[in-house]
């Protein structure tokens, strides 16, 4: 037990931290500031909590988000009063939308210093609006045992709200009066003997609450089993148990004889061994109108978020197929607005009771076999085309990575074009790679900081990013002095926003380059030198492969691929339809 009896603020803050430690908190990210001094001292002094100081609040929040993405446990995030907490907002939005648990502690002035132009004071009450699972303003610190008990129970409640019924953001606003530094107040020290704090912390342990399953999958199986033509969509999702995730989907697919259309931003493509019903080429396939018409399903079972693919969205929107979504969140996860039924549970939590009650899988395999045959041909087309492509084009990068990384590498894929190229060309493999991403709100802010959080104290990791997303978060490199682990950054430098080359606005030459592509003309070698980050310019695919396996165990480095975004866009325009041609092979 690690309590600090030097004054009322140190005791209050150390009870917060000790309670969190007993609940399972292991990591806190702290931004510098005066009003948060009691919290900073308490977190930094606790031997069981890893505390990382980060200057920039926006970067700090995304770094914490990255750690929480990897560990699936809450990370504490601490800042001072005023605008500091406002800089957390982009990461708060992403955390809410992608179900990542964070405990945010914003220090604040006491009530008598609000609304009177006291320095560094803003209205922090419900600062993050509806993006929190829970918000509370703590009372001012007190030594009354009744209020200390209130504090303990409130922290326990905050931990639970960050995890159940679904993961997300909890905001605790924490007012403090002076003294903020750990100046000794003799009357506080006597509490050490007056109160039995061993009993005070009894029965605090990591929550084992499980989500309630309000619906069971087998209630719907009879209908699914009666439909020969169905698909399972393994959508965007980050699993804390990839083997179970893949096995659950595999068992459902085997029972129903449905193909699994697996988004690159879920683990399924990287656990392809033994999963013969995996389909990775659906986006390309659906560009062939004849095939798209032939393969219209009667049933769609979506697991998690809908994939990135615009082709898949338009296909299912046009045909308005019966649609089921398996996900524990109370949100709508159907941007298509189909006739959708929600099974409000997590794919991991399904106990597969239905295997005991249902008939064996259907015998009509023609629909499944058609999907598998076409998928095999298109994969062959992709391999043939990209194997003979020696030029540094963005399309070949995910193809190379999916075949050459060391097993179990963590891969953070930035938004805009990297996630789309991954969906097109990330090949099925048995590497057990773990994809990470910020697809809650799909923004480019915080890309580098989140990736560093994912890589912190983990196995060697990889970030795939464009130049604009990296430039948007260069303050993330300030984390370098406290970073433990390794991150290789593959920088696709096409000097601007490649995704806009795919949109109709690209034809408007008078405004396109300055206002949409926004080239920054940065020398990344010099930029990396400023932050003391290793930089290597990639000149060919052979050089890149040599640097990928094995990855280093420590440090941060940038591998820069210089590409032409206009040529990349033209390549997609010229080749995607060709890749979908099967010619009855």
Swiss-Prot record:
Single Gene Ontology BP annotation: menaquinone biosynthetic process
GO molecular function, one term: 2-succinyl-5-enolpyruvyl-6-hydroxy-3-cyclohexene-1-carboxylic-acid synthase activity
Listed cofactors: Mg(2+); Mn(2+); thiamine diphosphate
Disulfide bridge positions per record: none
Membrane spanning residue stretches: none
Enzyme class: transferase
The protein's Enzyme Commission number: 2.2.1.9
Catalytic reactions of this protein: isochorismate + 2-oxoglutarate + H(+) = 5-enolpyruvoyl-6-hydroxy-2-succinyl-cyclohex-3-ene-1-carboxylate + CO2
Source taxon at top rank: Bacteria
Keywords recorded for this protein, A-Z: Magnesium, Manganese, Metal-binding, Thiamine pyrophosphate, Transferase
Keyword RNA-binding: no
Entry note: cofactor: Binds 1 thiamine pyrophosphate per subunit.
UniProt pathway annotation: Quinol/quinone metabolism; 1,4-dihydroxy-2-naphthoate biosynthesis; 1,4-dihydroxy-2-naphthoate from chorismate: step 2/7; Cofactor biosynthesis; phylloquinone biosynthesis
Subunit and partners: Homodimer.
Known role: Catalyzes the thiamine diphosphate-dependent decarboxylation of 2-oxoglutarate and the subsequent addition of the resulting succinic semialdehyde-thiamine pyrophosphate anion to isochorismate to yield 2-succinyl-5-enolpyruvyl-6-hydroxy-3-cyclohexene-1-carboxylate (SEPHCHC).
Family: Belongs to the TPP enzyme family. MenD subfamily.
Protein name: 2-succinyl-5-enolpyruvyl-6-hydroxy-3-cyclohexene-1-carboxylate synthase
């Amino acid at each position: 037990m690690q309590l600090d009896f030097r004054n009322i603020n140190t005791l209050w803050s150390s009870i917060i931290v000790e309670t969190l430690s007993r609940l399972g908190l292991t990591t806190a990210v702290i931004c510098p500031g005066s009003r948060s001094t009691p919290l900073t001292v308490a977190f930094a002094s606790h031997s069981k909590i890893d505390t990382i100081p980060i200057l920039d609040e926006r970067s700090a929040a995304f770094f914490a988000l990255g750690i929480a993405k990897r560990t699936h446990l809450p990370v504490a995030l601490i800042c001072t009063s005023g605008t500091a907490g406002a800089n957390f907002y982009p990461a708060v939005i992403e955390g809410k939308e992608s179900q990542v648990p964070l405990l945010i502690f914003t220090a604040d002035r006491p009530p008598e210093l609000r609304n009177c132009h006291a320095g560094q004071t803003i209205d922090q009450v419900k600062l993050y609006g509806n993006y929190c699972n829970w918000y509370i303003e703590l009372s001012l610190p007190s030594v009354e045992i009744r209020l200390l008990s209130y504090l303990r129970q409130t922290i326990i409640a905050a931990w639970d709200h960050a995890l159940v019924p679904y993961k997300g953001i909890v905001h605790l606003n924490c007012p403090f009066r002076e003294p903020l530094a750990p100046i000794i107040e003799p009357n506080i020290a006597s509490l050490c003997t007056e109160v039995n704090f061993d009993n005070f912390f009894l029965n605090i342990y990591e929550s084992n609450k499980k989500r309630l399953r309000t619906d069971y999958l087998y209630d719907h199986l009879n209908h699914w089993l009666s439909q020969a033509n169905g698909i399972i969509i393994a959508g965007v999702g980050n699993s804390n148990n990839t083997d179970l995730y893949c096995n659950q989907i595999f068992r459902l697919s085997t029972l129903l004889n449905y193909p699994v259309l697996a988004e690159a931003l879920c683990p399924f493509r990287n656990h392809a061994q033994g999963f013969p019903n995996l389909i990775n080429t659906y986006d390309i396939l659906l560009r062939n109108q004849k095939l798209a018409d032939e393969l219209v399903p009667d049933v769609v079972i979506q697991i998690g978020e809908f994939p990135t693919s615009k082709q898949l969205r338009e296909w299912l929107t046009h045909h308005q197929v019966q649609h089921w979504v398996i996900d524990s969140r109370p949100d709508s996860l159907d941007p298509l607005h189909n006739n959708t039924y929600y099974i409000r549970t997590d794919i991991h939590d399904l106990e597969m009771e239905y295997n005991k009650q249902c008939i064996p899988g259907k015998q009509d395999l023609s629909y499944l076999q058609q999907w598998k045959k076409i998928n095999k041909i298109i994969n062959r087309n992709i391999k043939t085309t990209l194997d003979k492509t020696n030029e540094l084009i963005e399309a070949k990068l995910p193809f190379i990575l999916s075949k050459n990384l060391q097993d179990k590498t963590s891969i953070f894929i930035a938004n805009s074009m990297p996630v789309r190229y991954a969906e097109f060309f990330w090949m099925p493999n048995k590497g057990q790679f773990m994809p990470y991403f910020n697809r809650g709100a799909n923004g480019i802010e915080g890309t580098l900081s989140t990736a560093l959080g994912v890589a912190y104290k983990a196995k060697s990791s990889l970030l795939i990013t464009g130049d604009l997303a990296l430039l948007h978060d260069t303050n993330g490199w300030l984390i370098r002095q406290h970073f433990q682990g390794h991150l290789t950054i593959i920088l696709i430098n096409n000097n601007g926003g490649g995704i806009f080359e795919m949109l109709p606005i690209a034809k408007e030459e008078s405004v396109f380059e300055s206002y949409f592509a926004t080239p920054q003309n940065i020398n990344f070698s010099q930029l990396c030198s400023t932050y003391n980050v290793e930089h290597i310019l990639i000149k060919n695919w052979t050089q890149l492969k040599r640097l990928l396996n094995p990855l280093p165990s420590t440090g941060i480095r940038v591998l820069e691929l210089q590409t032409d975004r206009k040529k990349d866009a033209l390549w997609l325009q010229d080749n995607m339809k060709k890749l979908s041609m099967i010619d009855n092979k």
